[in-house]
Amino acid sequence: MNTEIPDLEKQQIDHNSGSDDPQPIHDDMAPVSRIRSSGPNHEYIHIADQKFHRDDFYRAFGGTLNPGGAPQPSRKFGNPAPLGLSAFALTTLVFSLCTVQARGVPNPSIAVGLALFYGGVCQFAAGMWEFVQENTFGAAALTSYGGFWMSWAAIEMNAFGIKDSYNDPIEVQNAVGIYLFGWFIFTLMLTLCTLKSTVAFFGLFFMLMMTFLVLACANVTQHHGTAIGGGWLGIITAFFGFYNAYAGLANPGNSYIVPVPLDMPFVKKD
């Protein structure tokens, strides 16, 4: 099967040339005279004399932290999203397991090291690399949540004296609740940017948003059951993160199980 799209080459008139004839624009880019598709289900795209698979074009995909259709970046580097997503997911999982008191461990101190170096430094570095990849959404998300985990670790560490600066434990919990509510607002903003993406991508940010909201409520109300609920939401969030990270790592060349992106139900297909 072969379909063609009419000539896309455009010319502009140089009004200063004194000629009524259109003058072509000359630059370093080769003109694209024709785009066509071929193969079963139009899986190949032909641009001039070059052939690409449709999968070579970026689309909404959790494995790249790309919330919508986007052109390929001009620089060729490895995909930093799986590193950032894995760092986020593992740190979130350990923290959330402590929150639900798995195996009788309510103290989240074991997650401080992860929050500093993996969920913090590694995730932040992955976010910086997303800027190089020209992915603004991925950069904003990974650097911000890397900063979140480092700031949470600072709150938990006695060396910073943050908790000791408050007069009583109730005041500490209220302050942490305000802190988490701020992160709920930020995550709500990101979630709204994933409505045209995939189910797994949207699910990650929606569940994270709900986790922040429930944990914020648990802190300001000092309600133990609400905190447990927030912990379970965090566990679900972590597995969404692991799934999106795996989606960015797996391909037909290294795995027999390659996730297929499932678009949100109301997203229009091109």
UniProtKB/Swiss-Prot annotation:
Chain positions found as Phosphotyrosine: Y58
Residues that bear Phosphoserine: S74
Alphabetical list of PANTHER family matching this protein: ACCUMULATION OF DYADS PROTEIN 2-RELATED
Transmembrane segments: 80-100, 109-129, 137-157, 175-195, 198-218, 227-247
Keyword annotations of the record: Membrane, Phosphoprotein, Transmembrane, Transmembrane helix
Name this protein carries in UniProt: Glyoxylate pathway regulator
Family that this chain belongs to: Belongs to the acetate uptake transporter (AceTr) (TC 2.A.96) family.
Chief site of localization: membrane
Pfam families found in the cross-reference section: Gpr1_Fun34_YaaH
Gene induction: By acetic acid and ethanol.
Molecular function as annotated in GO: acetate transmembrane transporter activity
Region of interest (Disordered), ranges: 1-33
Organism: Yarrowia lipolytica (strain CLIB 122 / E 150)
GO CC, alphabetical: plasma membrane
Domain of life (superkingdom): Eukaryota
Function (record text): Plays a role in the adaptation of cell metabolism to the utilization of acetic acid, possibly by inhibiting an anion-transporting ATPase and affecting the plasma membrane H(+)-ATPase. May be indirectly involved in the repression of genes encoding glyoxylate cycle enzymes.
Effect the entry attributes to changing S74 to A/Q: No effect on sensitivity of cells to acetic acid
Subcellular location: Membrane
InterPro entries, A to Z: AceTr, Gpr1/Fun34/SatP-like, GPR1_FUN34_YAAH
Membrane topology, as annotated: Multi-pass membrane protein
